[in-house]
Amino acid sequence: MSDRLRIGTWNVEYAAGAAKNARRIARMREGEAAIWVLTETHDELVLGDGYHVLPTEQRPHGRAGGRWVAIASRFPFTRAIPTHDPLRTVAGMIETPLGAVIVCGTVLPWHTDPGPSGDSRSWVEHHRVVPEQAAEWAALRAAHPGVHLCVAGDLNTDLGGAHYYGTKRGRAALVEGLRAADLVCLTSTDRVPAGWLGHPPIDHICATASLAARASVVEAWDGTAPDGLRLSDHSALAVELRGPR
């Protein structure tokens, strides 16, 4: 059995359009990612029969089948793990070549997210939700001490490089939350090879610190295809995690 595992994440901009979905799927299947954490997705975007899918609940607005997050895995889920916010987060345990891994997919609030009240000011929701989700990551680590944890999805903040999107407060809270849960961001700007993306990523893959030294970004592409077709307003990334030698 291989001691390598590739995990990717992509915000697919609500997975609208059959022709665009075909292009999105083809692009993702070009690589070797065994697990994809898709955000702003839809049930119509199906990677193939070889994938097991664990989605969030139906989005309360928009067309039927819309999901904030769906985890698609070539390896079966051994269990689903309840989350505090089943609309925007989903978690499941997967037996992988590196052993058991809990994958937690999420969409953190963006700058104009109106929040439950419908009138939250810019970045207020992001600042409120990051500590809540960080506490959940730490709780998952405490409840499953022998299991690797991967948190991935649309974090709506760049990390580890020149400022692009986010706030100092939100970035600091996210960094501290990852640290407290023994997680390392594997897709910070400084970890993405120069020239691969037009802008620093705000979608990220984070994993247990013990895996970080043997992890690297292996794929990244912008949301607009080389022929000019817009497939998303977000870039996609994939990392490879390697087991001990």
Where are these regions (language model features)?
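Active-site regions of metal-assisted phosphoester/phosphodiester hydrolases
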Residues: 1-9, 13-26, 73-245
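Extracytoplasmic/secreted cell-surface and envelope-processing proteins
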Residues: 46-47, 159
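Proline-aspartate-enriched helix->loop->beta-strand connector
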Residues: 33-36
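Short, ordered beta-strand-loop transition motifs
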Residues: 57-64, 82-86
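Short, charged, surface-exposed secondary-structure boundary motifs
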Residues: 61-73
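Short, polar loop motifs at secondary-structure junctions
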Residues: 38-44, 210-211
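Active-site regions of enzymes building and remodeling cell-envelope glycoconjugates
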Residues: 49-59
